[in-house]
Amino acid sequence: MKQYLDLMKKVLEEGTPKADRTGTGTRSIFGHQMRFNLQDGFPLVTTKKCHLRSIIHELLWFLNGDTNVAYLHENKVSIWDEWADENGDLGPVYGKQWRSWGAADGRQIDQLKNVLTQLRQDPDSRRIIVSAWNVGELDKMALAPCHAFFQFYVADGKLSCQLYQRSCDIFLGLPFNIASYALLVHMVAQQCDLDVGDFVWTGGDTHLYNNHLEQTQLQLSREPRALPKLVIKRRPDTLFDYRFEDFEIEGYDPHPTIKAPVAI
């Protein structure tokens, strides 16, 4: 994951000081891309320990179309708590948009089911896309989508995916985002009888919060270790039937956790 450390270093050295919604302040660059060949290992940051339970359960929660934190709480995941209301609701965030996008004519569009159909029936299509950026519902969301738009691509029997992330918290958020979408590519590839290709991450406003700079320097002082391997132990009937127990990460040997505050 040297690419990730290189991005941190670039933002520290070249980033523009900017104000932000949270009032914390950032160093920011605009426009950056990283490519991860998923055949080379699972792209999970090794220079600090990442909370795998949160990454996996959050993705399963998205795939279920859920937008209430109750499921996350049942599985000891608290990463969305700061934005939930008193009932645990977040409004029409990722799960709602992925599984039940509200069309102008009243239809509810399951974008992920459409993606699976396209990959099986027309894998050369340039329209195999999921968007979470529903302009008509942004004001109802507890947090506007950061990872907003992703596209699948098939070549030589391999499935690749590119994500556009309009806003990226490099220290806390990005390791989760990379691992989450890499996991999704593996799951979709299994369901569509494809091998995995590349995960391409593209960032818009890509930033380090000012209260993460000390932690960033600590992380940059550490040497990356070998990437782990993802093992999917079962092939369920559909993309929406995976369970936490279906996944195993082999050979993950990270440096210790580095704690940092969340900018809300």
UniProtKB/Swiss-Prot annotation:
(6R)-5,10-methylene-5,6,7,8-tetrahydrofolate binds at H51, D169, A263. DUMP binds at R21, R126, R127, R166, S167, C168, D169, N177, H207, L208, Y209. It is found in: Cytoplasm. Gene3D superfamilies: Thymidylate synthase/dCMP hydroxymethylase domain. The active site is at C146 (nucleophile). GO terms for biological process: dTMP biosynthetic process; dTTP biosynthetic process; methylation. It comes from the Bacteria. It catalyses: dUMP + (6R)-5,10-methylene-5,6,7,8-tetrahydrofolate = 7,8-dihydrofolate + dTMP. InterPro entries: Thymidate_synth/dCMP_Mease, Thymidate_synth/dCMP_Mease_dom, Thymidate_synth/dCMP_Mease_sf, Thymidylate_synthase, Thymidylate_synthase_AS. GO terms for cellular component: cytosol. Its main location: cytoplasm. Transmembrane segments: none annotated. Its EC number is 2.1.1.45. SUPFAM superfamilies: Thymidylate synthase/dCMP hydroxymethylase. One of its GO terms (molecular function) is thymidylate synthase activity. Pathway: Pyrimidine metabolism; dTTP biosynthesis. Catalyzes the reductive methylation of 2'-deoxyuridine-5'-monophosphate (dUMP) to 2'-deoxythymidine-5'-monophosphate (dTMP) while utilizing 5,10-methylenetetrahydrofolate (mTHF) as the methyl donor and reductant in the reaction, yielding dihydrofolate (DHF) as a by-product. This enzymatic reaction provides an intracellular de novo source of dTMP, an essential precursor for DNA biosynthesis. Homodimer. HAMAP family: Thymidy_synth_bact. Belongs to the thymidylate synthase family. Bacterial-type ThyA subfamily. This is Thymidylate synthase.
